[in-house]
Amino acid sequence: MARLKEIYRKEIAPKLKEELQLANVMEVPRVTKITLNMGLGEAVGDKKIIENAVADLEKITGQKPIVTYARKSIAGFKIREGWPIGVKVTLRSDRMYEFLDRLLSISLPRVRDFRGLNAKSFDGRGNYSMGVKEQIIFPEIDYDKIDALRGLDITLTTTARTDDEGRALLRAFKFPFRN
């Protein structure tokens, strides 16, 4: 079992149940999935960019990402319907907890000029989104073998009903929020 999953079950869930004054342990908010998305607008003319992004995301997550395609043609962005424009991967269960553990303990401390995560990046339903400017903060990526610095979006989907419940859950996981 993943280290963070065990910590959640033994320490975080009972503490949150008391803190949020919930009647049942099944009401306690939990992280259900983590979605990593890499938007590749520059990949319009080059298939190699997509292949490199897939390889990077696969190294980071240990899971094969899927390529996302444009749903509509947009002349302003010079894209056609059906062209590949990004890659994404959804992590659940043990892989999700292992990724979260690596993100919090290894990757975020490696971010240059890191002052903490924005505590206001919740969506109103307890889900949290954050962006990473460069993929080299992950130790799985070899700096010498990357072709370009690419950012990615990380979305944590939780069962929390409100932002405050979601914030309490992520604080219990020791998320480094700014304020």
From Swiss-Prot:
Gene3D superfamilies: 3.30.1440.10. InterPro entries: Ribosomal_uL5 (IPR002132), Ribosomal_uL5_bac-type (IPR020930), Ribosomal_uL5_C (IPR031309), Ribosomal_uL5_CS (IPR020929), Ribosomal_uL5_dom_sf (IPR022803), Ribosomal_uL5_N (IPR031310). PROSITE patterns: RIBOSOMAL_L5. The keyword Calcium does not apply. GO terms for cellular component: ribonucleoprotein complex; ribosome. The keyword RNA-binding applies. GO terms for molecular function: rRNA binding; structural constituent of ribosome; tRNA binding. Keywords: Ribonucleoprotein, Ribosomal protein, RNA-binding, rRNA-binding, tRNA-binding. It comes from the Bacteria. One of its GO terms (biological process) is translation. Part of the 50S ribosomal subunit; part of the 5S rRNA/L5/L18/L25 subcomplex. Contacts the 5S rRNA and the P site tRNA. Forms a bridge to the 30S subunit in the 70S ribosome. PANTHER family: 60S RIBOSOMAL PROTEIN L11-RELATED. NCBIfam families: PRK00010.1. HAMAP family: Ribosomal_uL5_B. Belongs to the universal ribosomal protein uL5 family. This is one of the proteins that bind and probably mediate the attachment of the 5S RNA into the large ribosomal subunit, where it forms part of the central protuberance. In the 70S ribosome it contacts protein S13 of the 30S subunit (bridge B1b), connecting the 2 subunits; this bridge is implicated in subunit movement. Contacts the P site tRNA; the 5S rRNA and some of its associated proteins might help stabilize positioning of ribosome-bound tRNAs. This is Large ribosomal subunit protein uL5. It comes from Pseudomonas paraeruginosa (strain DSM 24068 / PA7). The lineage of its organism: Bacteria, Pseudomonadati, Pseudomonadota, Gammaproteobacteria, Pseudomonadales. The gene is rplE.
